[in-house]
Amino acid sequence: MKRIDPIPKNLSPDALLRSLGITEPRDIDVEAIAYYVGLRVKRRCLKCCEAMITGLGNKGIISVNPVVMPQRERFSIAQELGHWAHHRGETVACRATDIGKFSKTNNVERAADQYAADLLMPWSMFRIECR
């Protein structure tokens, strides 16, 4: 798999999946997608959150807490991909106490959450599975 270098900012989840030729939900591998867009996934103990992303230019690292359930880990990686797609180059810090409050940080988290949902359950595939 060849990396996109650099990945366009605000690339939609559907466009990203299409560029990878992914047409089946079972083929959505968030770690492979992360690698494709210039990110590495590392598991390490995090005290204040379940996942975080740090980057410079077009490369970065998603750190994810290894003690969470696999489904939560998958969503956390997808959510950090949302930050990469929408907020790359910005300094954004979110604490656990920020979640659920109306603030600029909350809007940033909502955008990343929506990106993760659209990446993991793209409507084009999800609607077929629902029939």
Question: Language-model features: where?
Answer:
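Active-site hotspot residues in diverse enzymes, especially metal/ion-binding acidic/histidine motifs
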Residues: 1-131
